[in-house]
Structure formats: C-alpha cells, structure tokens
Swiss-Prot record:
PANTHER family: PEPTIDYL-PROLYL CIS-TRANS ISOMERASE-RELATED, PEPTIDYLPROLYL ISOMERASE DOMAIN AND WD REPEAT-CONTAINING PROTEIN 1. Residues 38-197 form the PPIase cyclophilin-type domain. SUPFAM superfamilies: Cyclophilin-like. Keywords: Isomerase, Rotamase. Its EC number is 5.2.1.8. CDD domains: cyclophilin. PPIases accelerate the folding of proteins. It catalyzes the cis-trans isomerization of proline imidic peptide bonds in oligopeptides. It catalyses: [protein]-peptidylproline (omega=180) = [protein]-peptidylproline (omega=0). One of its GO terms (biological process) is protein folding. Belongs to the cyclophilin-type PPIase family. This is Probable peptidyl-prolyl cis-trans isomerase. One of its GO terms (molecular function) is peptidyl-prolyl cis-trans isomerase activity.
Length: 215
C-alpha cells in the first residue's frame, strides 16, 4: 500500500472514530436532557414526548429536595422506587396548566405527608412553562405538581414555584388528561448541584428550617 493510499485510509478511519464519539456524546446529551448550564434538571419522558425542566434548588430547596427525592426513590416513602414513574396527568385545563404526580390519579392522593410552602417573591407564575406545586391550601404540598400553559400571576404567593421548562413546551401543550409519565430522570451538572443531597435526612432538616422560618 503506497503512502498516499495509507494516509487516505487513516484519515477515513479517524473521521469515522471521531464521528462515533460525536454520536455517543450527542446521545448522552439527549438522554440527560441538554447541553445546559450548571444546575439540577428533570428529564420527564411522557407518552407525548420529553419535557426538560430546570429545578430552582437554591431558591426552593425543600420543594426541590422533595421532588428529586420522590423521582429518584431516595425518600423513605418510596423505598427505592421511583415515585413518579407510571403516574398520569390527571388534570389538564386548556390555556391554563397540566397537573400530575397523584398516585391515586384523581387529585386526592399524595405521598402520605405534607410540607410548607416556599414562595420566594423572585419566583413567579409569569410565563408558560412554570413548574409549581399543587396544593389544597397553605402548607399542604405533597407530590402533585403542575406546569403552566400561560402566565398565571394570580397563583403567586399561593403555590410554590420550583422550576421551569427549558425544552419541550410543545409536549406540555400536547398533553391531555390520562397521559403518562413514563420516567423522570434527574440530571445534576456542576459542583453545587452534585452537592445537593435529596435523602430523607436532608428533607427533614429542610422542612424543619422552612417551618420555623414561616412562623
């Protein structure tokens, strides 16, 4: 094999190798959500497609700890089981929001406990794609959440905003009542996100702190 042919073969092999690496990286990014900034993200796979949510763990740590702990099965109530997997969006109101996270599937269920609100004035229901906690009044948060279709400012101060859609608003708009959460994967990027623990001890500590601050 002459030198020129050898160089061509090596070039083709290198191109294919780099291409495979690029495809693997793209697949990993798709599986983990996006090539995004540091933070904690929830990649929600539904029967309509994927919704990627940025979680505001620094401004609503208790609420995010609860959501992530349920999603990953690290809270005592889950016993190692991903809580949200297989649950439905039981309530959908056009031009308002989609609501899910109820193990009963009818709006009456929850994880078996409640925790206080974290209504940071900087976090508002000011746009489509806001992730917020459903409740039955102050201090009744559990596992149910909703994602807005539009801005809903009348909910400010009444429901805890703890995240926002960064990809998949078209999926949010396509969801209908009865659609399913097939999986909910948590992705951590950056040192602060990786230090954010979401186990039962951390949840209990945060709940105690937020409860004391609200008195």
């Amino acid at each position: 094999m002459n030198t020129q042919v050898w160089r061509v073969c090596v070039g083709v092999m290198l191109f294919c190798f780099v291409g495979r690496i690029g495809c693997a990286e793209e697949k990993m990014v798709r599986e983990e959500g996006l090539a995004v900034a540091d933070g904690i993200y929830a990649v929600m796979e539904t029967n309509r497609g994927t919704i990627v949510l940025s979680l505001f763990f620094e401004k609503a740590p208790l609420t995010v700890c609860n959501f992530v702990g349920l999603a990953e099965g690290t809270l005592a109530v889950c016993k190692g089981r991903p809580f949200y997997q297989g649950l439905t969006f039981h309530r959908v109101i056009k031009d308002f929001m989609i609501q899910g996270g109820d193990p009963q599937g009818n709006g009456t269920g929850g994880p078996g406990y409640q925790f206080p609100d974290e209504c940071d004035p900087a976090l508002r229901h000011d746009s489509p794609g806001v992730l917020s906690m459903a409740n039955a009044g102050p201090g009744t948060n559990g596992s149910q959440f909703f994602i807005t279709h539009v801005a809903t400012p009348w909910l400010d101060g009444k429901h805890t905003v703890f995240g926002k859609v960064v990809e998949g608003m078209e999926v949010v708009h396509a969801i209908i009542a009865g659609d399913t959460i097939r999986s909910l994967k948590i992705v951590r990027r950056g040192a602060a996100a990786k230090r954010f623990v979401c186990d039962q001890a951390q949840f209990d500590q945060l709940r105690k702190r937020v409860s004391a601050a609200s008195k």
